[in-house]
């Protein structure tokens, strides 16, 4: 009998790095644009950025829901134990072979993972 891990957390570090890179661009832009300003103005800019990213995330979540992509990658973190659908290609192909019109396809997996990447990036802000 073999021992099976209850949780596969191996893609977590890669997902955190992707989220950090996504968050770094708007954060650096906001801090660069507001350099030399008072702290309260910097905080206001950070709040506006966070509100914008949250609204953007809600809109992309609606797109994810309307395209029925919520189960494109059914596990968390990652997609079938990988940080992106590229590594989960064989698992997605197997799921499509079993259920061609089912909830798992390559396009749906990418939509779901982009939604997750955006959320991780917003969480870093």
Locate each region found by the language model.
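Cytosolic juxtamembrane amphipathic/interface segments immediately preceding
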Residues: 32-36, 107-108
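Membrane-interface helix-boundary motifs at transmembrane edges
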Residues: 34-44
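Short, strongly hydrophobic alpha-helical membrane anchors
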Residues: 1-11
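N-terminal signal-anchor transmembrane alpha helix
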Residues: 46-68
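Hydrophobic alpha-helical transmembrane segments of multi-pass membrane proteins
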Residues: 114-118
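Extracytosolic (periplasmic/ER-lumenal) interhelical loops and adjacent juxtamembrane/interface segments
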Residues: 1-3, 66-113
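Hydrophobic core of alpha-helical transmembrane segments in multi-pass integral membrane proteins
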Residues: 13-32
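Conserved small/polar residues in nucleotide/adenosyl-binding loops
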Residues: 123-125
